[in-house]
């Protein structure tokens, strides 16, 4: 019986050792799975934070470019009154040589002024046949045989924009 007992104890020891190895392996597997999960979560957080950082960088760059493009908007808008005055001076009829020379000088000044405005992104809004509330300001409506309803009849004051932003709409009369 002692041999059986010895054999039984040996078998128990082997089973116990095997179970311990198996338990240890299970613990290692569980730990490895937990670590992998933690790693995956941290990697995901890193990727999201990195993507958010890149988006912030792009947005800041876009805002910077926009601020630069529109920085002179208020100043340019104020200069439009000067432009209107120069254009009005050009439209005055001249009857003597001195007045013609002055008008020529004003025209040269106006041309230079327009080039400088254009250099800084200020552009004349092109005349459109159809009324566009994004570009035009209707001052009044008129009956017109030559125009369809909603068409621009007369430009009363030129409009200007910087890039795609209107700084002064074109003031127009519109056909009824």
From Swiss-Prot:
Homodimer. GO terms for biological process: protein folding. It comes from Campylobacter jejuni subsp. jejuni serotype O:6 (strain 81116 / NCTC 11828). GO terms for molecular function: adenyl-nucleotide exchange factor activity; protein homodimerization activity; protein-folding chaperone binding; unfolded protein binding. The gene is grpE. Signal peptide: none annotated. Residues 1-30 are annotated as: Disordered. It is found in: Cytoplasm. This is Protein GrpE. GO terms for cellular component: cytosol. SUPFAM superfamilies: Coiled-coil domain of nucleotide exchange factor GrpE, Head domain of nucleotide exchange factor GrpE. Belongs to the GrpE family.
